[in-house]
Amino acid sequence: ILVLTFMAAAKLGMRVSLLNNLAAMLFVLPFFLFSALAGQIADKYEKSWLTRLIKILEIVIMVVAAFGFVFEIYPLLFVALFLMGTHSTFFGPIKYAYLPQAMTTNELVGANGLFQMGTSLAILTGMMLAGVLMKLDSPLFWISGVTVFVAIMGYLASRFIPVMTAPQPDLTIDWNIFRTSWQTIANLYRLPIMWFTILGNSWFWFYGATFLTQVPEFSKSILLGDESVVIFLLTLFSVGTALGSLLCKTLTKNQ
């Protein structure tokens, strides 16, 4: 998104706000389309194997993105962004469902908090690194190399994930993404505590995404700043999320 905001907008002759929102939409769209299907796959197959498979696909996607960066093929970068959104959609249920299998009930809240904190800090580190790379000579080459390197490191790390038994190996997967999504929503609605918890969580991310998507343009057009201003504002959000995650165990008293 930083590349689209500070480099691609002028070359493509498009408004920064349009590019920002288009990029955000392409990344989020797979969550709406494939989340229910991803949950079924996470229940049917062993999670460490699935993680390694997804991380291999991530390397392929990052190679595609690197090609788009180096040759400045911006439509290809949009395709890679959609594919990374799809990657995150299928990886999400795996990583969040792994903890209940690996942790006891008393450990779960704290583990979830640490998990979310780690995610926030990783995002923060990535944003800071992106800002540094954008200031270097030939930034697109650096970005290409770093993204592929990080994807490879992610795959290597996935090889150390302990094997866990698949919860529902006999599950028959319904590949109709619209039917499965509707059925999932209907089932959640019958469980008020789950329904309202998910609504609250979804509202938080909806509210955050609405504002965070506008940060690059706000920094560039209103504050007249560069990438460092964007990173500072996004850092505040990430740090807040990380601190809140740490407080989860204390606030909930493991309930």
Indicate residue ranges for each PLM-predicted region.
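Helix-to-loop junctions at the C-terminal end of transmembrane segments
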Residues: F32-E46, M134, L243-Q255
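Cytoplasmic helix-loop-helix junction between adjacent transmembrane helices
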Residues: A80-L121
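Juxtamembrane intracellular "pre-TM" segments in multi-pass secondary transporters
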Residues: V163-L199
